[in-house]
Amino acid sequence: MILMKKFEIILFLFIAVLIFVFGYFVGASQPLYSENPVIQYFKNPKPFTVENVNMPVTYYGTICGKYIGYQITPHNVNEEARKCFYKYFKLKDKNPKEAERYLKRGLFLTEYLISQADKETAEVDEKNITFIVWRYNFEFPLYNLSKGWRGALCQAGCLKTLYLAYEATGDERYLNYANLAINAFKVPVEKGGLLKIRIYKNKSYYWFPEYASENPPYVLNGFITATLWIGDFGNKTGNADALYLYKEGLKSIKTFLPMYDAGDWSYYDALGHRCNKHYEHLHRLQMLWLYNKTGDEIYLKYYKKWRE
């Protein structure tokens, strides 16, 4: 009986040692991360995994006689991702469990955006620029845009999303993608990028079109938001290209702003379409936003004028 118990103890210890050794060597062959399980999950995704998540889907209906229907757009995906990251930052100290739920969704949507980005290279001023850009997988007949069109507002939103993912995780991979995204604003629209040179009084100005084409409608609100988000990225990272693009964007806003003045109202684009109430309200907020950012009185002037 005593011999039996001794045997059982020795067997138990032997098995325990085997488990420890096996676990040590198997574990040593796997990447070790100090981050929380949510971040580990996205660093080690399992191929062919089906995620049961809600994707933001936009219903466009029929535009100019063309049925667009339901579409998953990079613009609305990045908007939803940003909301998740903001929730994560707000809750991570007060409610870590709930915060991780938002982090997981934000990272999932960010990874989706990365998977949908097109990586391209264009020659600009005898230099090759590699960039990523997001496209819309449907026609947009309102501005005669073919399937595969792109826009600066969407691009800047994806840029902001990538930076938030980097801020939340510290993963340099997201910052690297953000740097590729900013490069698209250095490449002319004609070469697949999001830079349009707009001429006024024989001078050249940078414009980042919300609806990119060789002859864009020059929508004001999208250009302002894109410029400010580019500047935000530049200020947070020190990216010299972003800071330069921001400076040029502000110069263009100030130059062309009077052309969008309809008296007591504002124009949506350079084609003379008056804003609806939603975009009129947005223009006023943007004037206040620009004034607070720059201290330039011209923005306060238009805020007060359009507010009356």
Swiss-Prot record:
It holds the Pfam family C5-epim_C. InterPro entries: 6-hairpin_glycosidase_sf, C5-epim_C, C5-epimerase. Keywords: Signal. It comes from the Archaea. Residues 1-28 form the signal peptide. GO terms for biological process: carbohydrate metabolic process; heparan sulfate proteoglycan biosynthetic process. GO terms for molecular function: heparosan-N-sulfate-glucuronate 5-epimerase activity. SUPFAM superfamilies: Six-hairpin glycosidases (SSF48208). The keyword Signal applies. PANTHER family: D-GLUCURONYL C5-EPIMERASE. This is Uncharacterized protein MJ1128.
